[in-house]
Structures are given as structure tokens and as C-alpha cells.
């Protein structure tokens, strides 16, 4: 708690998306994102291997998350639908796939690998205030940081502006929740933000 208090007091942490730490890739041959490279090598650049999972999609769908079309590509009929563990992708006799694949946007050649982001910082600070670690517990402050963190995440993925406004308006007000309920909402947004970074999401 003392170390966290010191960090919060010193205010030397990143304060905008300009401080994001990323490993950069490019469209130059040999320097593409490895996730793109897997698809280019094995499936002709079309993602028929990696699909949306309900453990991320359902919490996003609950609040009409504006990142859905940035995270996932719709099925052949234009509908977003995810899979459960070990569930096969849904297709038809013509080979059209109806399950939502992880988006070509996330698997583009020059998609950077995020090491640490502004939205992570804000959501962690939100958790600090919700728990009262090194600071006075303050769910109103936690909610302010929560909203800012989710907004920053939507901005990072270039989600639609109007859809993001609607999404943010649907999120619960943490100040009206119990501590455990507030922490659940914060953790769920951390989980969603780390969807493309599974090691961090599980730590």
C-alpha cells in the first residue's frame, strides 16, 4: 500500500496515450506482426483459425461495447456471434463462416504489440480507489477513472465515436455499487482490454 501511495502521490505515471509502450511492426516484409504472419503462411491471410469467445464477447455485448466491430469481424450474414470453449465454428455447405473471427484489424500487418497503455493505467488507478489501497476509498473517483479508462480504450481501437458515447452511458455508475460489484466491473473492463494479450489478462 505504501508503494502504491507513493506512486499515486508522485504522479509520474503515464498521463495520455502518447505514453503508451508498444512494440512496433510495419508492412515491410519480414517486419510484420507475427499474428498476421501466421495467417499469411497458413490460411492465405484470411482468418479461419481464431474466433471470438463468449467469455469476452458476452460482457461486451451486455453494454453494446463500441469495440466489438474493432475486435471481431461479423459472420457471413453480418451478425456478431462468438463461440464457447471447444465449440466448432458455424458454417454452411458453401463454406461460409457464420462465427465471428478475431478481426482483420487486430491481425493487420502493422498492428503493434501493446506492452503497457494509458487505459491500463486509468483502470488500475480506478481499482486503487475502489479498494482504497494507499488512498482513501472513493467509488466516485473510481468511477471517474473507470469511465476515462474505457474511453481511452475505445479511442485506442478507433471505435465509432457515437457508439462509444452510447456504450459509456450504459456502463454502471461505480459510486452506486458495492465495492465488490465495482471491482467486478473494473476487472471485466481490464479483461476485455487485454483480450489480445492473454498472458497479461490471466495475471
Predicted ranges, named:
Residues 4-125, 130-131, 137-193, 198-199:
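Hydrophobic-face positions in mid-chain alpha helices that act as interaction patches
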Amino acid at each position: 500500500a505504501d508503494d502504491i501511495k507513493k506512486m499515486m502521490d508522485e504522479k509520474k505515471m503515464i498521463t495520455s496515450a502518447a505514453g503508451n509502450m508498444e512494440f512496433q511492426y510495419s508492412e515491410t516484409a519480414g517486419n510484420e506482426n507475427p499474428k498476421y504472419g501466421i495467417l499469411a503462411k497458413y490460411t492465405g491471410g484470411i482468418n479461419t483459425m481464431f474466433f471470438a469467445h463468449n467469455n469476452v464477447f458476452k460482457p461486451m455485448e451486455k453494454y453494446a461495447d463500441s469495440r466489438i466491430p474493432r475486435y471481431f469481424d461479423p459472420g457471413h450474414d453480418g451478425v456478431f456471434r462468438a463461440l464457447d470453449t471447444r465449440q466448432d465454428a458455424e458454417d454452411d455447405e458453401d463454406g461460409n463462416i457464420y462465427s465471428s473471427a478475431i478481426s482483420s484489424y487486430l491481425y493487420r500487418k502493422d498492428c503493434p504489440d501493446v506492452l503497457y497503455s494509458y487505459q491500463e493505467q486509468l483502470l488500475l488507478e480506478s481499482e486503487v480507489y475502489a479498494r482504497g489501497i494507499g488512498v482513501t476509498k472513493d467509488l466516485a473517483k473510481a468511477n471517474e477513472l473507470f469511465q476515462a479508462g474505457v474511453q481511452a480504450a475505445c479511442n485506442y481501437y478507433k471505435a465509432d465515436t457515437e457508439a462509444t458515447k452510447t456504450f459509456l452511458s450504459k456502463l454502471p455508475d461505480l459510486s452506486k455499487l458495492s465495492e465488490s460489484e465495482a471491482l467486478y466491473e473494473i476487472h471485466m473492463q481490464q479483461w476485455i482490454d487485454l483480450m489480445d494479450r492473454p498472458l497479461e489478462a490471466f495475471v
